């Protein structure tokens, strides 16, 4: 197997070894949540009288020879070595990609008789010239087609493609052999573009695609369920029937791309859900399709953007959507294989997580309305620590007429008329929601610690955060760093007016990653609002970040020079305060995501501008602090800086 699938000699030097097979690249893993590069066909085809079975693996082959190499300090610092990575910075070249098939035959005893590497009958770049990323791939359940989700470079067009195995030919040794192999591919064998999504914002890639098995005699159509955010601006489920319209292609001749080639007409597209709320699709969210009862189970925010619930709807005659989980909590659910049970991991701001199993009971004649009954507990909620006081969720309408949600941790020693120093904890970027009705006392326990020490802590999900629709999240398009601080400051003033315990002359802004970037941006744009900023692992110059993330939200640099400059905090250090002890920067030296270069460059600019700053480096940490001692040190550093200078 190794010799079949490895397209490279596996050299240790990244410069000498630019090719890989079956492995997702850094950007694909980090920015598209795809962590594999190969997909087993679920069925084996039997051929001939010798009882030979053909097994197939679809895999991605990647050539990174034109991708920049960057050097990150190695964890083995005492050896003074660096780790080398291929890292495509925004605007630079991405890897060249293609899809291939590994095909092998086994005898009746399961022994591999022969193996063959296959490639597409025409070069990938010729068949799909606008495709930059293979976001997802897999097989239909009957193994008749491989499928893939293709994205263009601006990430504004997604195509869902079917690839019949017959479209792949053995890897030829020369052009003459390629022509011979191509002759064996029938003219009506082709890729099918069964679905397209386009937007002028960006595509949020997800996993939800459920192709039904084609009924006997209806091979010219494919029915599937797909989640689509682009149609209405909110992610919803659709049942789609595509007609597999066949053309005629001479695969021996070089293929010349035409815009409408391979496109399939949509015979029917029925919305199963709708409204100003979202079906959860990103970050590994699933749907569960019961073909016997014609029901689809999904998770969504139909009741409130602050809670995730499990719902069910008929995909045959959609209409009523039934919620299966208890309101007042946010749930993360999974259905059993035979759809009679589900498990929920749920919590609220005031209730720690518990895990319960529920059985659906009721009439088989009306499966949509089966009611969940408590069946078993796998984990009961632990009791809160005695000094834990949950945050209070609030909402307000901004001057630009947008409803925003936030949460506030009240100082534990709050008294009427007393004003408290305040920490505005921020993330503020896309794909993240901090404010919801789930328990915060584990991941964000330090926010309660701050409240116990007399600080007020405020958290606001402004425009650009997720779970509120594409227009809301898309407020950041081409202007990262230019809208978020306004929402944070408006929320801060709302809390100050509503609760009366915030000392607006003593406000700190603090966050990590995108939150670190916004902490710096807050001190640059609103130095009269924020007395101090504590920025963890900040992006300081967007030109140094990767293609997949940066171009999705900011376009390529040459198309958005103004946006890149306005959003790069290291280019605006002259606006930072001249007073000492107002800026603390924290960064892991081994950060593989937001490279230490960002802090290095920022500090160089600060020194050139004669601006004061404090810097805390974590020599053995990456993008997230993992070592408990480092975590403790960070918390003490944070507290000390707040106590001394806020």
PLM regions: where:
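Alpha/beta-hydrolase-fold serine-hydrolase catalytic core, especially in secreted/extracellular enzymes
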Residues: 166-168, 232, 240-246, 251-252, ...
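Serine-hydrolase catalytic core recognition
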Residues: 28, 49-50, 68-69, 134-135, ...
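Intrinsically disordered, low-complexity domain-flanking/linker segments in eukaryotic proteins
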Residues: 44-51, 168-184, 216-220, 244-265
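Loop/turn-rich, solvent-exposed surfaces of beta-rich toroidal or solenoidal domains
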Residues: 213-238, 289-292, 298-299
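Short consensus segments that form the blades of beta-propeller domains
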Residues: 28-29, 86-93, 149-153, 227-230, ...
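Predominantly five- to eight-bladed beta-propeller fold
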Residues: 2-122, 169-184, 364-381, 434-446
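Structural recognition of the beta-propeller blade-terminating site
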Residues: 103, 161-166, 238-241, 314, ...
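Non-catalytic accessory segments flanking enzyme active sites
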Residues: 54-62, 66-69, 95-98, 122-138, ...
């Amino acid at each position: 197997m190794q010799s079949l699938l490895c397209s490279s000699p596996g050299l240790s030097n990244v410069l000498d070894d630019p090719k890989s097979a079956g492995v997702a690249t850094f950007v694909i893993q980090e920015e598209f949540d795809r962590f594999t590069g190969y997909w087993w066909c679920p069925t084996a085809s039997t051929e001939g009288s010798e009882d030979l079975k053909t097994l197939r693996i679809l895999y991605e082959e990647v050539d990174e020879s034109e991708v920049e190499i960057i050097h990150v300090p190695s964890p083995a610092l005492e050896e003074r070595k660096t780790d080398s990575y291929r890292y495509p910075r925004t605007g630079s070249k991405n890897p060249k990609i293609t899809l291939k098939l590994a095909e092998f035959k086994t005898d009746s005893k399961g022994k591999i008789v022969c193996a063959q590497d296959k490639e597409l009958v025409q070069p990938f770049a010729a068949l799909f010239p606008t495709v930059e990323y293979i976001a997802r791939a897999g097989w239909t359940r009957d193994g008749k087609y491989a499928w893939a989700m293709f994205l263009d470079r601006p990430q504004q067009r997604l195509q869902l493609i079917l690839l019949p195995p017959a479209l792949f030919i053995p890897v030829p040794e020369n052009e003459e052999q390629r022509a011979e192999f191509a002759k064996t591919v029938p003219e009506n064998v082709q890729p099918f573009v069964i679905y397209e999504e386009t937007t002028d914002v960006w595509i949020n890639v997800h996993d939800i695609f459920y192709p039904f098995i084609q009924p006997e005699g209806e091979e010219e159509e494919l029915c599937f369920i797909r989640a689509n955010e682009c149609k209405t601006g909110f992610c919803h489920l659709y049942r789609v029937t595509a007609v597999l319209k066949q053309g005629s292609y001479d695969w021996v001749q070089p293929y010349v791309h035409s815009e409408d080639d391979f496109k399939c007409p949509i015979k029917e597209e029925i919305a199963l859900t709708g409204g100003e709320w979202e079906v959860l699709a990103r970050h590994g969210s699933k749907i569960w399709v019961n073909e016997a009862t014609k029901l689809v189970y999904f998770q969504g925010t139909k009741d409130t953007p602050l809670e995730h619930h499990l719902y069910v709807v008929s995909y045959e005659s959609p209409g009523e959507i039934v919620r299966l989980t208890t309101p007042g909590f946010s749930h993360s659910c999974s259905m059993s294989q035979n759809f009679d049970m589900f498990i929920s991991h749920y919590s609220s701001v005031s209730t720690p997580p518990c895990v319960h199993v529920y059985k659906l009971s009721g009439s088989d004649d009306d499966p949509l309305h089966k009611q969940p009954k408590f069946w078993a507990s796998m984990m009961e909620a632990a009791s809160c620590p005695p000094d834990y006081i949950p945050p209070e969720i609030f909402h307000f309408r901004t001057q630009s007429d947008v409803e925003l949600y936030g949460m506030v941790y009240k100082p534990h020693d709050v008294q009427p008329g007393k004003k408290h120093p305040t920490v505005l904890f921020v993330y503020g970027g896309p794909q993240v929601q901090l404010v919801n009705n789930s328990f915060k006392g584990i991941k964000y326990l330090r926010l309660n610690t701050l409240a116990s020490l007399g600080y007020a802590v405020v958290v606001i999900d402004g425009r650009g955060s997720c779970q509120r629709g594409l227009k809301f999240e898309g407020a950041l398009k081409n202007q990262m760093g230019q809208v978020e601080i306004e929402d944070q400051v408006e929320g801060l003033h709302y809390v100050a007016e509503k609760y009366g315990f915030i000392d607006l002359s003593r406000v700190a802004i603090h966050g990590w990653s995108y939150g670190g970037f916004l902490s710096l941006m807050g001190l640059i744009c609103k130095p009269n609002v924020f007395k101090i900023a504590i920025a963890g692992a900040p992006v300081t110059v967007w030109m140094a970040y990767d293609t997949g993330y940066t171009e999705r939200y900011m376009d390529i640099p040459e198309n958005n020079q103004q946006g890149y400059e306005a959003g790069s905090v290291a280019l605006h250090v002259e606006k930072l305060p001249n007073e000492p002890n107002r800026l603390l920067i924290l960064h892991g030296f081994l950060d593989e995501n937001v490279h230490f270069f960002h802090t290095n460059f920022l500090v160089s600019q600060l020194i050139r501008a004669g601006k004061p700053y404090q810097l805390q480096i974590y020599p053995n940490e990456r993008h997230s602090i993992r070592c408990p001692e480092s975590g403790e040190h960070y918390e003490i550093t944070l507290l000390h800086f707040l106590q001394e200078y806020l």
